[in-house]
Design a protein with these regions (language model features):
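Short amphipathic alpha-helices and their capping/turn segments at secondary-structure boundaries
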Residues: 41-47, 70-87
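Active-site and ligand/interface coordination hotspots across diverse enzymes
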Residues: 1-69
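Glycine/proline-rich loop-helix segments at beta-alpha junctions forming the active-site rim
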Residues: 2-5, 97, 103-156
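Residues at alpha-helix caps and immediate loop-helix transition turns in enzyme cores, especially N-
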Residues: 67-71, 140-142
Length: 156
């Protein structure tokens, strides 16, 4: 995966002691965005040492390595309430769009590196939350990801 916006890799966020010395008011932020800027494969926020939670949404919107959008703020709230020390956000479709209709109109809404990002995150954390909602059925993508990642928790 090509990381356009930060030098921290998802691998180091999920599997290292990188955050052992963080102060309470410090949040590590990062994102893996394609060189063309059309796809966001992962986004992470880490506020303390300890386990992270992975969320899989429908598609990325405006959030990036430095900017949070409403979905990211909501997921940070869930992760903190559940006792996690950080989160990684991935999506069924990596195409960046503020409206699902725009994502659905894209030639390749999934993105060439998205399945690799999903598999990596799933294999490197214990809690993966399916949070894609009813529109995840587009192109049968919800079923594809459920088959690829058997250990999912669901938000209802």
């Amino acid at each position: 995966m090509t990381d356009k916006t930060t030098t921290t890799t998802p691998q180091s966020v999920l599997s290292s002691d990188l955050f052992d010395g963080l102060q309470a008011d410090t949040m590590e932020r990062g994102a893996t965005i394609s060189p063309c800027g059309l796809y966001r494969y992962s986004l992470w926020r880490k506020w303390a040492p300890g386990p992270m939670c992975v969320f899989i949404g429908l598609n990325p919107s405006t959030a990036d390595a430095t900017l949070d959008d409403p979905t990211i703020r909501r997921c940070v709230g869930f992760a903190k309430a559940w006792g996690f020390s950080g989160l990684m956000m991935l999506n069924l479709f990596a195409y960046r769009a503020t409206e699902p209709a725009d994502m659905k109109a894209a030639q390749d809404p999934i993105g060439p590196e998205n399945d690799d990002a999903l598999r990596f995150a799933h294999s490197n954390t214990t809690t993966v939350v399916a949070a894609w909602g009813a529109q995840g059925t587009f192109k049968g993508r919800d079923q594809q990801v459920r088959a690829m990642l058997p250990r999912l928790h669901y938000l209802r």
